[in-house]
Amino acid sequence: MTEHNIRNFSINFGPQHPAAHGVLRLVLELDGEVVERVDPHIGLLHRGTEKLIEHKTYLQATPYFDRLDYVAPMNQEHAFCLAIERLAGIEVPRRAQLIRTLFCEIGRLLSHLLNVTTQAMDVGALTPPLWGFEEREKLMIFYERASGARLHANYFRPGGVHQDLPPALIDDIEAFCDPFLKVVDDLDNLVMANRIFKQRNVDIGIVSVDEAMAWGFSGVMVRGSGIPWDLRKSQPYELYEEMEFDIPVGKNGDTYDRQVIRMEEMRESVKIMRQCVAKLREPAGQGPIASIDGKFAPPPRREMKRSMEALIHHFKLYTEGFHVPEGEVYAAVEAPKGEFGVYLVSDGTNKPYRCKIRAPGFAHLQAMDWMCRGHLLADVSCVLGTLDIVFGEVDR
């Protein structure tokens, strides 16, 4: 009887693979078609964001956050603004809080639509992404009408938002909700009820409650395992404690459960959007959209045409910026991909001393090796899709 030495072979997945979610390079060690080891190589989109922020004023640093998770930009700005507001003790007007809450939920729809439909494309269904991008286009137009930009909005400000929403935009957001829910139902039938989609996703990448905690997962990754942990409920910020919505949780902790949760979260986001629209129309929802503290918010433009003091105030605010009291703070938001946190250290000057960004995708990607082990090569893209990785925030 002859002996054969069976040697595992290694292949590269990415960084230019369509399912690699950006610039991910995975070095896969395979025994036949079974995955033995996954080695993620990150850093191909590293831009030194945290260091760049240290050399910018607080206002100039805000646009960097759009470029982290570029699928849902405003959610990232939100965490940075919350951190500054907590350090400086800035009070945000109610209308600004409502607008922020509304656009964070629009960001959640943008992210989940992309993830669920491209997950279907990764397993071979080509129609859902076309439907998803059609809806995302409408949401991006809302972004554009609010901030002037489709993608990198730079709309949130410490103390509020940049501009008020026109009444027609609020009406259009309300009109968007009902037809969108029908599209979600159609996607449910087309994707979630599809037997091939189920065969490819059920019992793949199972994560238990203890494992989710041990790996430092957040967002859909913990809710898929049955833990109802959502910062909007457990540590409410802005006006989420006033909103009525449910937290969908899974029971199997597999890839399929996580995608079902994303579908349900889109329905819950629409609920929150409707409540925000209703509250924006109430008398209590009227008023300023930025802090009335002149140290942090610029004067109205009409005043700058008449008042020399207002012009000087505006000039100082946009050249030197405002000074944040010395201290350190951690602010986190429930971004679509998980807990997005900003640890901000101020030395009392007009620039952050240190700004550490806690990206949810970074914690999720480290579990790639453990989740894929023993699965087939074809399942790697399913597991990667369910982690919902965006490389802007992983590499920073």
Curated annotation (Swiss-Prot):
Q: What is its EC number?
A: 7.1.1.-
Xref: PROSITE patterns: COMPLEX1_49K
> Where, subcellularly, is it found?
Cell inner membrane
Keyword Lipoprotein part of the UniProt annotation: no
**One Gene Ontology term of the molecular function aspect:** NADH:ubiquinone reductase (non-electrogenic) activity
Q: Which UniProt keywords apply?
A: Cell inner membrane, Cell membrane, Membrane, NAD, Quinone, Translocase, Transport, Ubiquinone
Which topology term describes how it sits in the membrane?
Peripheral membrane protein
Tell whether Zinc-finger is among the UniProt keywords.
no
A GO cellular component term found in this entry reads: plasma membrane
Q: Which branch of life, at top level?
A: Bacteria
What SUPFAM superfamilies does this protein's entry cite? HydB/Nqo4-like (SSF56762)
Family, as annotated: Belongs to the complex I 49 kDa subunit family.
UniProt cross-references to PANTHER family, sorted A to Z: NADH DEHYDROGENASE [UBIQUINONE] IRON-SULFUR PROTEIN 2, MITOCHONDRIAL (PTHR11993:SF10), NADH-UBIQUINONE OXIDOREDUCTASE 49 KDA SUBUNIT (PTHR11993)
The subunit structure is: NDH-1 is composed of 14 different subunits. Subunits NuoB, C, D, E, F, and G constitute the peripheral sector of the complex.
UniProt function note: NDH-1 shuttles electrons from NADH, via FMN and iron-sulfur (Fe-S) centers, to quinones in the respiratory chain. The immediate electron acceptor for the enzyme in this species is believed to be ubiquinone. Couples the redox reaction to proton translocation (for every two electrons transferred, four hydrogen ions are translocated across the cytoplasmic membrane), and thus conserves the redox energy in a proton gradient.
- According to UniProt, the name of this protein is NADH-quinone oxidoreductase subunit D
- Tell me the organism: Methylorubrum extorquens (strain PA1) (Methylobacterium extorquens)
